[in-house]
From Swiss-Prot:
Cellular component aspect of the GO annotation: plasma membrane
InterPro entries: AcrB_DN_DC_subdom, Acrflvin-R, Multidrug-R_MdtC
UniProt lineage: Bacteria, Pseudomonadati, Pseudomonadota, Gammaproteobacteria, Enterobacterales
Cystines in this chain: none
GO MF: xenobiotic transmembrane transporter activity
Keywords recorded for this protein, A-Z: Cell inner membrane, Cell membrane, Membrane, Transmembrane, Transmembrane helix, Transport
Annotated compartments: Cell inner membrane
NCBIfam families on file: PRK10614.1, RND_permease_2
Protein name, as recorded: Multidrug resistance protein MdtC
SUPFAM superfamilies membership: Multidrug efflux transporter AcrB pore domain, PN1, PN2, PC1 and PC2 subdomains, Multidrug efflux transporter AcrB TolC docking domain, DN and DC subdomains, Multidrug efflux transporter AcrB transmembrane domain
Domain of life where this protein originates: Bacteria
Record field: transmembrane: 3-23, 333-353, 360-380, 387-407, 431-451, 463-483, 528-548, 853-873, 875-895, 897-917, 953-973, 984-1004
Length: 1024
């Protein structure tokens, strides 16, 4: 450590280098993006296809299956699911984490092209795809409402003007419009009028399509100029379509208005959006990857006044919900914890050193290390989020350790009579290796985590690198700036001290002397101390195995998602009234700020709600308590069920479900799946460890099954294609023509008027035109009867799948729920044709369960290797690592005491403890080895003196680390659920470890020294 003198003798250069580090950190801080959690870019692509009027089973067999066969051949697909409903199919592809999303998108487009020839010819457009991130919840929801404009007009303004402007804002990734559909001209046919006039549905469709064409007409050139030809070949409004002549009947023109009601309406009338129970069109905004959430929301808010100017004054554009408030509050809480941690750490130093000048040294080292870390975070592309700020909060107790060790040793020499400059040179060299060992071994803890693949590695990479960088900067500061400041600020001890300081020093001396006496007795009965060590190891293993576990702590983000489901035969109008009723009840809750909901689309028996809660400081109750209260209010509502779950900042898996966790049932036999799914669902619903159990299997929809008499059809001159075309024209909401406008394109939609299709008698009014042009009643060759039919068909891979979703009641961990599910499935005795497995977050939790122990063992092994290299010894690292069992025991006992399940956040706390508690042993072992080698001191006396000599810095560093994490334990504001497990783990582990390792480490050192000195067997040469 001779290089220390280079900095000690050049204080100006050292201070300027430190200033440069601080300035670069401040600059990086200003440019860092802000987010709730590290960016998790799940490579997911959704392929969408539509065939209006097609049944879910038809969509599954003719659209989903060809696409799945082509898409399933793409390399790197980890999960492929599809959902087919009335007229639409979505195939969701989740790729491996290391798969480039842009390359995957090119492969997806190629697969779609390859499957195109196998898809039905009547599809209005080619299948399309989009990149999505399932973990990205909406950052803002805007609403448009009006007393004078229709929902279709509001939707048109939103899609043609607002969506374009919003998409251009920096940071906006996706803008989705919901709550209605685009304007359209609707042709609602009167079957009886068609029959009376001798007009077929196909004739109406052909007439409309031929009357609205958009083709170039060319130009005429005369000698002087060119004349472009323009015709009135396009029709734009219902009024222009009504007088169209379809045919002449008995010498009179049969116009469209004679056989149909033609109105300016919307493409899909079964679509509704609401804001606080008032009709509204919804604008849902998501951010782009790597975007700063706060800055993006601020830019959107700044643009809102300009957006309002682009729409009529009678339209109210409001921001219904945005996520910035809870993110700001959560980050503010972490920043407060960070400030309190730094203050407590400095207070600990002052209490022990009893000198303002000495306290100033670590008081400078801590913020310099933390601020300098911001520069590295910016260069690494990180963000200011809960995890990175938690890393800095915890680091405030770590980075001071190096400065404390150096400062305490230099102060000891100053108190012994050396001049500050000499003390800085000598003291810095003495502990230089110790400081390097402490810091390098602490950073080594995170090497396995950084090498970890999958979600754990991606999620905690920012935390690990941020903490490692702050420790590395602290190491540099402690070996450069700290000795310089010690040489300039410390003063030789005054002969007289103030009574207050003398009293504290005397108290510390008494404690140290008491520790010395106790250590003597422990060393005299070393076997008992070793037994305590072994017992703590056994108890740690037992606690880890029996501890309730979960994936991530349940967060209170101030946002809830509600899913409403009614009977599968529920009509759109009935469902709309139910959704409005649920929204009124939810909005009346004192904790709810606003409610935005929608229903409709192709599934008329379901709806959804986005619920924004009031600030936590205002509502008092956490999200789970609000959910429990609303659940009890709405439990007895007839005809529909509402499922609620708290929105989480991280969501794994692209599969949509009503609950936060999923269990999937797969089978190659759809009949077996439909037979066993209700049994398993009932079994899950009876488990006290689960709530809100639901299934996405909807196979009880009302269907009218038509049976054709093909012999009679042949005799009448009718083809099956003609009949299916008739049914599609009548009931398929068929888009038969396109209206082109400057800003958008709109559709002409044809179908039987709802007044004539309210019951099954509508089929009796259907007539098919045969090959001779004669109208033939549908009932003359077809019969029909009601039956059950699926509202949607789900696939995973190429197998039928049904997903059971569930939530957890308060106080139940995911491991307890998973164990209950496994027991229930075993008890049911499912056949081999039905396979069950967890999906989404629950599946990742199962995978991480097996990797957690290996991650801890890998961290211990890495630290052992690093320490072995530093000490050039196989034995001494074992002495240092002997501190770990007591720390693990304390951490797990603390989690049990606070009724907190073991999560990934607690796992990070365990890894941190591996790095923290060994510092105490390092300080003891270093000085004991030095005393043995340089002074020839006996091993027992060496470790005894080392323990006494390093007692003060050990207590100081442990208290600093403990108090640095204490604000995390005591936090109660926004985001506290994420911070508390980390603080509880660290504080609990440090308390127990401090009480035990001060005694067990010297004992282990003695036994290891005996092991090292044990005579080895050597071959005896043969005597001649």
């Amino acid at each position: 450590m001779k290089f220390l003198s280079l900095f000690i003798y050049r204080p100006v250069a050292t201070s300027l280098l430190t200033l440069a580090l601080v300035l670069s950190g401040l600059l990086g801080f200003r440019m860092l993006p802000v987010a709730s959690l590290p960016q998790m870019d799940f490579p997911v692509i959704v392929v969408s296809a539509s065939l209006p009027g097609a049944s879910p089973e038809t969509m599954a067999s003719s659209v989903a299956t060809p696409l799945e066969r082509a898409l399933g051949r793409i390399a790197g697909v980890s999960e492929m699911t599809s959902s087919s409903s009335l007229g639409s199919t979505e195939v969701v592809l989740m790729f491996d984490f290391d798969r480039d999303i842009n390359g995957a998108a090119r492969d997806v487009q190629g697969a779609i092209n390859a499957a195109q020839s196998l898809l039905p010819s009547g599809m209005p457009r080619r299948p399309s795809y989009r990149k999505v991130n399932p973990s990205d919840a909406p950052i803002m929801i805007m609403t448009l409402s009006s007393d004078t404009f229709s929902p279709g007009q509001l939707y048109d303004y939103a899609s043609t003007q607002l969506a374009q402007r919003l998409s251009q804002i920096d940071g906006v990734g996706d803008v989705t419009i919901g709550g209605s559909s685009l304007p359209a001209v609707r042709v609602d046919l009167n079957p009886q009028a068609l029959f009376n006039q001798g007009v077929s549905l196909d004739a109406v469709r052909t007439t409309i399509a031929n009357a609205n064409v958009r083709r170039p007409q060319g130009a005429i050139d005369d000698r002087q100029q060119r004349w472009w030809l323009k015709t009135n070949d396009e029709l734009h409004t219902a009024a222009e379509y009504r007088p169209l002549v379809i045919r002449y009947h008995q010498g009179a023109a049969v116009r469209l208005q004679d056989v149909a009601t033609v109105t300016d309406s919307v493409e899909n009338v079964r679509n509704a959006g609401m804001s606080n129970a008032r009709p509204a069109v919804l604008v849902v905004i998501r951010k782009s990857p790597q975007a700063n959430v706060i800055d993006t929301i601020d830019r959107i808010r700044d643009e809102v006044p300009q957006l309002r100017k682009t729409i009529p004054a009678a339209i109210q554009l409001e921001i219904a919900q945005d996520s910035s408030a809870t993110i700001r509050a959560s980050l503010h809480e972490v920043e407060q914890s960070l400030a309190v941690s730094v203050g407590l750490v400095v207070l600990v130093v002052f209490a022990f050193l009893r000198s303002g000048r000495a306290t100033l040294i670590p008081a400078v080292a801590v913020p310099v290390s933390l601020i300098g870390t911001f520069a590295a975070m910016y260069l690494c592309g990180f963000s200011l989020n809960n995890l990175s700020l938690m890393a800095l909060t915890v680091a405030s107790g770590f980075v001071v350790d190096d400065a404390i060790v150096v400062l305490e040793n230099i102060s000891r020499h100053v108190e012994a009579g050396l001049k500050p400059l000499q003390a800085a040179l000598l003291g810095g060299r003495e502990v230089g290796f110790t400081v390097v060992s402490m810091s390098v071994s602490l950073i080594a803890v995170f090497i396995p985590l950084l090498m970890q693949g999958g979600i754990i590695g991606r999620f905690f990479r920012e935390f690990a690198i941020t903490l490692s960088v702050s420790i590395a900067i602290s190491l540099v500061i402690s070996l450069t700036l700290t000795p310089v400041m010690c040489a300039r600020l410390l003063r030789s001890s005054a002969p007289r001290q103030q009574p207050r300081r003398r009293g504290f020093g005397r108290m510390l001396l008494v404690v140290q002397q008491g520790y010395g006496r106790a250590l003597h007795r422990v060393l005299d009965h070393a076997r008992w101390a070793l037994l305590v060590f072994v017992a703590s190891l056994g108890l740690t293993v037992y606690l880890f195995i029996s501890m309730p576990k979960t994936f991530m702590p349940e967060q209170d983000t101030g946002r809830l998602m509600g899913f409403i489901q009614a009977d599968q035969s529920t009509s759109f109008q009935a469902m709309r009234s139910k959704v409005e009723h649920f929204m009124r009840v939810v909005h009346a809750d004192p904790a709810v700020e606003s409610v935005v909901g929608f229903t409709g689309g192709w599934e008329t028996n379901s709806g959804a709600m986005f619920i924004a809660l009031k600030p936590l400081s205002t509502r008092g109750d956490n999200a789970q308590q609000v959910i429990a209260r609303l659940r009890s209010k709405l439990a007895k509502e007839a005809g529909a069920t509402l499922w609620l779950r708290a929105v989480q900042d991280i969501r794994i898996g692209a599969r949509q479900s009503d609950g936060g966790y999923q269990y999937s049932l797969l089978s190659d036999s759809l009949d077996d799946l439909r037979q066993w799914q209700p049994k398993i669902r009932r079994a899950f619903a009876s488990l006290p460890e689960l709530v809100d159990v639901n299934s996405d299997q909807q196979d009880k929809g009302a269907e009218m099954a038509l049976t054709y008499d093909r012999t009679r059809m042949a005799r009448l001159g009718i083809d099956v294609a003609d009949v299916n075309g008739l049914l599609n024209n009548a009931f398929g909401q068929r888009q038969i023509s396109t209206i082109y406008q400057p800003l958008n394109q709109y559709q002409v939609v044809m179908g039987v008027d709802a007044r004539y299709a309210q019951d099954i008698n509508a089929l009796n009014q259907m007539y098919v035109t045969n090959h001779q042009g004669q109208p033939i009643p549908l009932s003359s060759f077809a019969s029909w009867q009601p039956a059950n039919a699926p509202l949607s068909v789900e696939h995973e891979g190429l197998s039928a799948v049904s997903t059971l979703s569930f939530n957890l009641p308060e106080g139940v961990s995911l491991s307890q729920a998973a164990a209950a599910i496994d027991r229930s499935v075993i008890a049911l005795g499912m056949p081999s044709s039905v396979r069950g497995s967890f999906s989404g977050t629950a599946a990742v939790f199962e995978q991480t369960q097996s990797s957690q122990l290996w991650l801890i063992l890998a961290a211990i092994a890495t630290v052992y290797i690093v320490l072995g290299m530093l000490y050039e010894s196989y034995v001494h690292p074992l002495t240092i690592l002997s501190t770990l069992p007591s720390a693990g025991m304390g951490a797990l006992l603390a989690l049990k005491l606070f009724n907190t399940p073991f999560s990934l956040i607690a796992l990070i706390g365990i890894l941190l403890l591996i790095g923290i508690v060994k510092k105490n042993a390092i300080m003891m072992v270093d000085f004991a080895l030095q005393a043995q080698r340089q002074d020839g001191m006996p091993v027992r006396e060496a470790i005894f003196q080392a323990s006494l000599l390093r007692f003060r810095p050990i207590i100081m560093t442990t208290l600093a680390a403990m108090l640095g994490a204490l604000p995390l334990v005591l936090s109660s504001g926004d985001g506290a659920e994420l911070r508390q497990p980390l603080g509880i783990t660290i504080v609990g582990g440090l308390v127990v470890s401090q009480l035990l390792t001060l005694f067990t480490t010297p004992v282990v050192y003695l036994y290891m020294d005996k092991l090292r000195r044990k005579p080895r067997w050597r071959p005896v040469p043969a005597q001649s």
